[in-house]
């Protein structure tokens, strides 16, 4: 080492470990309109001050590492570092805090959810100084939002493609989810669509297994769809699951779906990955396909209250990455979903501008500028008695998806679809006449069942089915 180098080292660099809070805790920082803002629920290890914990999150998810390094002097850390700018104790919780972190926009590649998540929810979640860490919300600034295509088409374009307005759309997941041959699968699709449903759906588990290869399924489902359309005069769709082991295979399946002329395909966006999902979303926009998104694996990430990532963040990420539908819980069915919180992220999916509202778990005002909206899908353990509540909770721009609630009808698949369609039309008519669905829902269904034997049979089968468990995802 030359004497000149030694002199520079002694002046410009001091080795050792520094407290994160000296650099990354900046309570006087005024956030910029271009910053990505994050709200983390932080549970520090005993003895770790909240300021140090919040600063550690900001550091490890941006420019920091565990020790001072030579190359810090070769860039401007003040320009690129994340900053913990506010800390709030969580009411009713001991040693737990909401730490707000601001990230400069230049830290992230344009149009890449993958890159954004690699930083913000990357290695920092394994940091030893923290007992637990959960990302509660993100504010995506318009400057970053505009670098994404977003959903292939959006709510209004889908309505226009289907020529269906003024009511929720109806769907059904084909059951049993695994084991049917392609021809029997197509038969179930036809019966459900003929009975009055708008969509049927591949289960997320269905890709291309030995009992039913994807090409056979696509062919029989397309035949079923066209036959049902010819008989009902309505445009129908089946969510053909294009999820595959490689992006190339996924696109091959999407191309075949387009060649068949079907209106919609499907992707499991978490198990498939954001890079694959964005790739498929771009293909769907370019080729006129709607894109249905399933959220398989989300509960691994979002169900624990103290660690992981809230679904509202995954919902925002999906709106950026691209999808025209996404499953969003039901509030009333068998799957997790507390009402105010669910409606909070439903608004984040559909609306152009959403104000901060902590009572619904929304930590930041979100402006989506020109990104189209996503239709929420209510699915999981729902049946005809739930129809008034679902119509009231989710409104018209939604898909109400009944799997067992269609195929479990005692008279068969088509009568099950008829029962759901009659129940929906009755609820929409009652709402439009000014009736209170929340208070009069059961009576509305009983009245409709008097002139629909299919609905009456469904009401009798599911009159005592309830899923009354407390939601784990509370504020």
UniProtKB/Swiss-Prot annotation:
One of its GO terms (cellular component) is chloroplast. Its EC number is 4.1.1.39. The keyword Metal-binding applies. Heterohexadecamer of 8 large chains and 8 small chains; disulfide-linked. The disulfide link is formed within the large subunit homodimers. This is Ribulose bisphosphate carboxylase large chain. The record marks 334 as: Transition state stabilizer. Residues 1-2 form a propeptide. It catalyses: 2 (2R)-3-phosphoglycerate + 2 H(+) = D-ribulose 1,5-bisphosphate + CO2 + H2O; D-ribulose 1,5-bisphosphate + O2 = 2-phosphoglycolate + (2R)-3-phosphoglycerate + 2 H(+). The disulfide bond which can form in the large chain dimeric partners within the hexadecamer appears to be associated with oxidative stress and protein turnover. The lineage of its organism: Eukaryota, Viridiplantae, Streptophyta, Embryophyta, Tracheophyta. It comes from Citrus sinensis. Binds 1 Mg(2+) ion per subunit.
């Amino acid at each position: 080492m030359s004497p000149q180098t030694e002199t520079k080292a002694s002046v410009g660099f001091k080795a050792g470990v520094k407290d994160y809070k000296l650099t990354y805790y900046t309570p006087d920082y005024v956030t910029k309109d271009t910053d990505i803002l994050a709200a983390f629920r932080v549970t520090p290890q005993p003895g770790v001050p909240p300021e140090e914990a919040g600063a550690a999150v900001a550091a490890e998810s941006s420019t920091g590492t565990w020790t001072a390094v030579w190359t810090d002097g070769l860039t401007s850390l003040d320009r690129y570092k994340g900053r913990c700018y506010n800390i709030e104790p969580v009411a009713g919780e001991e040693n737990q805090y909401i730490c707000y972190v601001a990230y400069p926009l230049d830290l992230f590649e344009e149009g890449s959810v993958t890159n954004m998540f690699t930083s913000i929810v990357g290695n920092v979640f394994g940091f030893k100084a923290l007992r637990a860490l959960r990302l509660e919300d993100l504010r995506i600034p318009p400057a970053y939002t505009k670098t994404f295509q977003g959903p292939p088409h959006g709510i209004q374009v889908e309505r226009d493609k289907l020529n269906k307005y003024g009511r929720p759309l109806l769907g059904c997941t084909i059951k049993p989810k695994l084991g049917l041959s392609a021809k029997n699968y197509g038969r179930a699709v036809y019966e459900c669509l003929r009975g009055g449903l708008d969509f049927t759906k591949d289960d997320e588990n269905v890709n291309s297994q030995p009992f039913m290869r994807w090409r056979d399924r696509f062919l029989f489902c397309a035949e079923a769809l066209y036959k049902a359309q010819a008989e009902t005069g309505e445009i129908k769709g089946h969510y053909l699951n294009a999820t595959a082991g490689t992006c190339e295979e996924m696109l091959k399946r999407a191309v075949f779906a387009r060649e068949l002329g079907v209106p919609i395909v499907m992707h499991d966006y978490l198990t498939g990955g954001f890079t694959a999902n964005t790739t498929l979303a771009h293909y769907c926009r370019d080729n006129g396909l709607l894109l249905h998104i399933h959220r398989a694996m989300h509960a691994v990430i979002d169900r624990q209250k103290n660690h992981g990532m809230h679904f509202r963040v995954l919902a925002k990420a999906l709106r950026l990455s691209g999808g025209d539908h996404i499953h969003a819980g039901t509030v009333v069915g068998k799957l997790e979903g507390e009402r105010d919180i669910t409606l909070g992220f439903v608004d984040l999916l559909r609306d152009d501008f959403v104000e901060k509202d902590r009572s619904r778990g929304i930590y930041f005002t979100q402006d989506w500028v020109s990104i189209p909206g996503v239709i929420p899908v209510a699915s999981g353990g729902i049946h005809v008695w739930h129809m008034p509540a679902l119509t009231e909770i989710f409104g018209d721009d939604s898909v109400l998806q009944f799997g067992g609630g269609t195929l479990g009808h005692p008279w068969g698949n088509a009568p099950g679809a008829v029962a759901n369609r009659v129940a929906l039309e009755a609820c929409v008519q009652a709402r439009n006449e000014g009736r209170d669905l929340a208070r009069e829902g059961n009576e509305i269904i009983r009245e409709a069942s008097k002139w629909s034997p299919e609905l009456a049979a469904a009401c009798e089968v599911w009159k005592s089915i309830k899923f009354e468990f407390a939601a784990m995802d509370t504020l």
